[in-house]
A protein has these predicted regions:
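Nucleotide-activated chemistry modules centered on ATP-dependent adenylation/adenylyltransferase
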Residues: 1-179
């Protein structure tokens, strides 16, 4: 969906983690034509500030996943969305709408998984112990969701509106006084 990403590194990481293959679909055109342009035309901005870039990207990602799953004759797809957020619903409704027979593996809803990994710290420790490269660190625990339309950040330290986000977090912007 147009994020800035080192896909060779993603491929290497996927294979190192046990994937049998890595398939990269370029869905930027579909994302722009089917979702971004109509959203701009409709002035689709949540609460007058949020561009909906994350939620807009999910249908085109889900469609690509289902098309690939069907081509590879897979019975299952998976996502890494937490069991608390809207993303799991966005993905799964799209999956089932496109292929009602598909089975979805959602690790964050599997008790054995979420009991083992209570949060980001546990995941970071596990990745480090297995030599799995990740961009987050304990000092920079936020995750990003980036696409052609926007970028969003998420982490516990960002949930408190009285806490100013770290200046080195921003990727597409910077403080006005530094512009």
């Amino acid at each position: 969906v147009g994020q800035e990403e080192d896909f060779d590194a993603v491929r290497e990481k996927a294979l190192k983690c046990g994937a049998k293959d890595f398939i990269l679909d370029d869905v930027r055109r579909e994302f722009v034509e089917e979702l971004i342009f109509p959203a701009i035309q409709a002035n689709a901005i949540y609460e007058d500030v949020y561009l909906l870039g994350t939620s807009l990207a999910r249908p085109v990602i889900a469609r690509g996943m289902i098309e690939t799953a069907e081509k590879m004759q897979c019975q299952f797809v998976s996502h890494g969305c937490t069991g608390k957020g809207n993303d799991q619903v966005r993905f799964e409704l799209a999956f089932y709408g496109l292929n009602p027979d598909i089975k979805v593996i959602a690790p964050w809803r599997i008790p054995k998984f979420y009991q083992r990994f209570a949060g980001r710290s546990d995941l970071l420790e596990y990745a480090a112990s297995k030599g799995i490269p990740v961009t987050q660190t304990k000092s920079k625990p936020w995750s990003t969701d980036e696409n052609l339309f926007h970028i969003s950040y998420e982490a516990g330290i960002l949930e408190d509106p009285n806490t100013t986000p770290p200046a080195d977090m921003w990727k597409l912007t910077q403080a006005p006084e530094k512009a």
